[in-house]
């Protein structure tokens, strides 16, 4: 990993190494969440215990899906992976999260630089009020990834190609990103996220605001992106998780109930709570 201070999608992925690892992660919200032990905060009734002792391995060049009912903690845990919870008042995380063996919560780690390595795509497309070109160029500019204008143009083109939108926008790069359709805006946001060459790409329900055609385009793109990046996707759609991921984690009431190969989760789950969720009996 650089210094942070500065196939068929349903097939099982061969796990050669782990890109990220989380161990004993708890997340607490509330005025009482402070620099106390996890046990102390768990006993405090003024504190919401949102994530409870979660261990997860994120494999290299693999799509990992987080599924579970609304409020189960899957999006909260996703934000742990690039310290987005740092921006929320009264939120406290305990445990350890590493990116290629380095503790991302080490005080020496710059969260802004971390987020260049662990990119994020949000539920609702959120292009900046800038041109298509400047949306994609934003990250490389602030992180100093381009030596000159030609370098920057090359990064923008490659990122738009990786997001499968280059052919649709190559003749209007100066047009506002906000003028694109919803599906195009989401692919623009994906291009913006991959422009800093992240090692992990987090996606928080990236298709929930899209129509079926745009959803299919993004799902196809996710399978292509995993040839270069580790992808972690939160989704309410079990069908989508089954289509795009190789590993699936099922969350319920802040607990990681089961984490396994996607095929096994959906055909032969080990925990009865997982079976109840995927068959529609809970959720």
Curated annotation (Swiss-Prot):
One of its GO terms (biological process) is phosphate ion transmembrane transport. ATP binds at residues 68-75. Residues 35-278 form the ABC transporter domain. It is a peripheral membrane protein. Gene3D superfamilies: P-loop containing nucleotide triphosphate hydrolases (3.40.50.300). SUPFAM superfamilies: P-loop containing nucleoside triphosphate hydrolases (SSF52540). One of its GO terms (molecular function) is ATP binding. Belongs to the ABC transporter superfamily. Phosphate importer (TC 3.A.1.7) family. The lineage of its organism: Bacteria, Pseudomonadati, Pseudomonadota, Alphaproteobacteria, Rhodobacterales. Part of the ABC transporter complex PstSACB involved in phosphate import. Responsible for energy coupling to the transport system. Signal peptide: none annotated. It comes from Jannaschia sp. (strain CCS1). This is Phosphate import ATP-binding protein PstB. The complex is composed of two ATP-binding proteins (PstB), two transmembrane proteins (PstC and PstA) and a solute-binding protein (PstS). The keyword Glycosyltransferase does not apply. InterPro entries: AAA+_ATPase (IPR003593), ABC_transporter-like_ATP-bd (IPR003439), ABC_transporter-like_CS (IPR017871), P-loop_NTPase (IPR027417), PstB-like (IPR005670). It catalyses: phosphate(out) + ATP + H2O = ADP + 2 phosphate(in) + H(+). It holds the Pfam family ABC_tran. Its EC number is 7.3.2.1. It is found in: Cell inner membrane. Its main location: membrane.
């Amino acid at each position: 990993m650089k210094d942070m201070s500065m196939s068929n999608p349903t097939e099982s992925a061969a796990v050669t190494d782990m890109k990220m690892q989380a161990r004993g992660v708890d997340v607490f919200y509330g005025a009482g969440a402070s620099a106390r032990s996890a046990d102390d905060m768990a006993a405090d009734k003024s504190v919401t215990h949102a994530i409870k002792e979660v261990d997860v391995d994120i494999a290299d060049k693999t799509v990992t899906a987080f599924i579970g009912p609304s409020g189960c903690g899957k999006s909260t845990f996703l934000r742990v992976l690039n310290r987005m919870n740092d921006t929320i008042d009264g939120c406290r995380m305990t445990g350890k999260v590493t990116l290629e063996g380095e503790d991302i919560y080490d005080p020496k780690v710059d969260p802004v630089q971390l987020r260049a390595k662990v990119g994020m795509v949000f539920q609702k497309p959120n292009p900046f009020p800038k041109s298509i070109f400047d949306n994609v160029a934003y990250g490389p500019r602030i992180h100093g990834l381009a030596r000159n204008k030609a370098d920057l143009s090359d990064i923008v083109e490659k990122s738009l190609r990786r997001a499968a939108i280059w052919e649709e926008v190559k003749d209007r790069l100066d047009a506002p990103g906000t003028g694109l359709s919803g599906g195009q805006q989401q692919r623009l946001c994906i291009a913006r996220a991959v422009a800093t060459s992240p090692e992990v790409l987090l996606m928080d329900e990236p298709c929930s605001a899209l129509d079926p055609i745009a959803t299919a385009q993004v799902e196809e793109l996710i399978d292509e992106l995993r040839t270069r990046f580790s992808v972690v996707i939160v989704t309410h759609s079990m069908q989508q998780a089954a289509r795009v991921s190789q590993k699936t984690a099922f969350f319920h009431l802040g607990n990681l109930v089961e984490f396994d190969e996607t095929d096994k989760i959906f055909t032969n789950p080990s925990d009865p709570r997982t079976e109840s969720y995927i068959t529609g009996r809970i959720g």
